[in-house]
């Protein structure tokens, strides 16, 4: 059974609020780079970049990050990591920049830890922040989001499903029991 938690308008409002918070906390956007975690985090990052351009009249670089090779729960740790999956990210100048990692849902924190490992393998930014559309709790690692669209406390057996129009043909967040 699924329950709608956020419709398209609620998602838009949440992303707009995150955008304003990014501007306020960073005192502008000139030294910011947005990095979306594949798959849905990339589309959320692009939307935030579009809104930042509207508000600040500045093109924000947006990168895509594939963390599959960095997940400790999905790969054999004896195998060497390949940076080919993130070669497009290596083209971005992250040195001394403020990187904002963007994902759809924050849950255990393992995805974010893997993303930080991937970024540090590429370059060393001045700062890494985290923006998520939904924070559902249940952290296994000491990671928290700096920018949150909506906190949705869930039971361990529940699941949050984020759908974005770019790949799912609609914007909606559902809670699945």
Swiss-Prot record:
It comes from the Bacteria. Its EC number is 2.4.2.9. It catalyses: UMP + diphosphate = 5-phospho-alpha-D-ribose 1-diphosphate + uracil. NCBIfam families: PRK05205.1-4, PRK05205.1-5. Belongs to the purine/pyrimidine phosphoribosyltransferase family. PyrR subfamily. Keywords: Glycosyltransferase, RNA-binding, Transcription, Transcription regulation, Transcription termination, Transferase. CDD domains: PRTases_typeI. InterPro entries: PRibTrfase_dom, PRTase-like, PyrR, PyrR_bifunctional. GO terms for biological process: DNA-templated transcription termination. A motif (PRPP-binding) lies at residues 99-111. It comes from Pediococcus pentosaceus (strain ATCC 25745 / CCUG 21536 / LMG 10740 / 183-1w). GO terms for molecular function: RNA binding; uracil phosphoribosyltransferase activity. This is Bifunctional protein PyrR. Homodimer and homohexamer; in equilibrium. Regulates transcriptional attenuation of the pyrimidine nucleotide (pyr) operon by binding in a uridine-dependent manner to specific sites on pyr mRNA. This disrupts an antiterminator hairpin in the RNA and favors formation of a downstream transcription terminator, leading to a reduced expression of downstream genes. Also displays a weak uracil phosphoribosyltransferase activity which is not physiologically significant.
């Amino acid at each position: 059974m699924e329950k709608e938690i956020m419709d398209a308008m609620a998602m838009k409002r949440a992303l707009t609020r995150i955008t304003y918070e990014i501007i306020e906390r960073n005192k502008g956007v000139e030294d910011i780079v947005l990095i979306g975690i594949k798959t849905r985090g990339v589309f959320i990052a692009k939307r935030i970049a579009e809104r930042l351009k509207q508000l600040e009249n500045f093109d924000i670089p947006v990168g895509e990050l594939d963390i599959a090779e960095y997940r400790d729960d999905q790969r054999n740790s004896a195998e060497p990591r390949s940076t080919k999956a993130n070669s497009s990210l290596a083209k971005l100048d992250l040195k001394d920049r403020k990187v904002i990692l963007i994902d759809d849902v924050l849950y255990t924190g393992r995805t974010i830890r893997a993303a930080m490992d991937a970024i540090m393998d590429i370059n060393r930014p001045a700062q890494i922040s985290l923006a998520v559309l939904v924070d559902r709790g249940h952290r296994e690692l000491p990671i928290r989001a700096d920018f949150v669209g909506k906190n949705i406390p869930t039971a361990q057996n529940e699941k949050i499903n984020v759908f974005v129009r770019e790949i799912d043909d609609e914007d909606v967040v559902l809670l699945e029991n």
